[in-house]
Regions:
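Exported/periplasmic ABC-transporter solute-binding proteins
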Residues: 25-64, 72, 84, 116-121, ...
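A short beta-strand-loop structural module common to alpha/beta enzyme folds
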Residues: 68-76
Length: 310
């Protein structure tokens, strides 16, 4: 009898331990603040991508009614500083994290970040409609950006320090040299368009998603205010090209860059769900419709543009 009682007690103890273990697992699961298709998160995004990311978030939230993605649009350098902020789940910029940034995330949050190029973007050059010149070689651009062009043109950016556009220009066009002190910093990409539209001797540099979609009413209104410049092609014998989707795809247009997300999650949360959406069929189609070039699913084809290039 005593032996049976001991066996019964051991059995009960075993059941209690199992119950506590299962309860603990369930509690851990329930403590997750979000899931791929449910919850709310905050992400930090390069301001030059605002039009296409606004559309991306709107479609995602429409497809997933239980989700809310708060987007903070900032200069790229500030987005990368946000990798150090616990509440920022994802950033979207034009480059991947570097080794220092990766190690900081691993050490601080015990998270191994994930990064993926989901689209290809370009920097569009715009001029005032009354400007006599709208075709520029790369040497012309370098001269303008350094203040030694034959005509006094004023470069205009969405900031002159921490933005992805300025970083690209300094790294890829000026090859490390400094911008002219005459460069003007607008408050945003829309501010660049507004400044150029009012200043005949201004030349602006903005992301193509602000002005590349001729089917978007807002961008059509921008196109009525400024003129898109043609830039000397990367390939000999082609002449001058504009930042159209076909030219971005082939890299015939020389000012091409990436759109990259960096995800900070140690479980499959809403950030994971949004990342999967951007790299999936619908997200890649949204990039294509915005006249960027999808980089994950490349079987959508490139949209033709019925515009004669000079």
């Amino acid at each position: 009898m005593s032996e049976c009682r001991r066996m019964s007690n051991k059995y009960l103890l075993f059941l209690v331990v199992c119950l506590l273990w299962l309860t603990g697992c369930g509690t851990k699961e329930d403590k997750r603040p979000d899931r791929p298709g449910q919850g709310a998160i905050t992400i930090s995004v390069d301001e030059s991508f605002k039009p296409v990311i606004d559309e991306m978030v709107q479609v995602f939230e429409s497809n997933k009614p239980g989700t809310k993605i708060k987007v903070l649009y900032k200069p790229e350098a500030e987005c990368f500083k946000d990798l150090e902020v616990d509440s920022i789940r994802m950033i979207i910029a034009t480059r991947r994290y570097n080794e220092y940034e990766k190690q900081f995330i691993v050490d601080s949050f015990n998270i191994s970040p994930e990064s993926l190029v989901v689209a290809r973007d370009a920097i569009t050059v715009i001029v005032n409609p009354k400007a006599p010149d709208s075709l520029f070689t790369m040497d012309d651009l370098r001269a303008i950006l350094q203040g030694r062009f034959k005509k006094n043109l004023i470069p205009v950016f969405d900031g002159v320090k921490a933005t992805s556009t300025v970083r690209f220009i300094i790294d890829s066009v000026l090859r490390g040299d400094s911008l002219t002190s005459k460069a003007v910093a607008a408050r945003s990409s829309e501010g660049v368009i507004d400044y150029v539209s009012k200043t005949p001797d201004a030349i602006g540099f903005i992301g193509v998603s602000w002005i590349g979609n001729s089917e978007d009413p807002g961008q059509l209104s921008f196109l009525k205010k400024v003129r898109v410049a043609g830039i000397e092609s990367s390939y000999k014998g082609i002449g001058f090209v504009k930042a159209y989707q076909q030219n971005i795809y082939t890299k015939s247009y020389p000012l091409v860059r990436d759109l990259v997300y960096t995800l900070k999650e140690n479980y499959k949360g809403l950030g994971f769900g949004f990342a999967a959406f951007m790299s999936g069929d619908i997200g890649q189609l949204i990039f294509r419709r915005a006249y960027l070039v999808p980089q994950v699913l490349k079987n959508f084809g490139i949209r033709s543009v019925e515009v004669e290039e000079q």
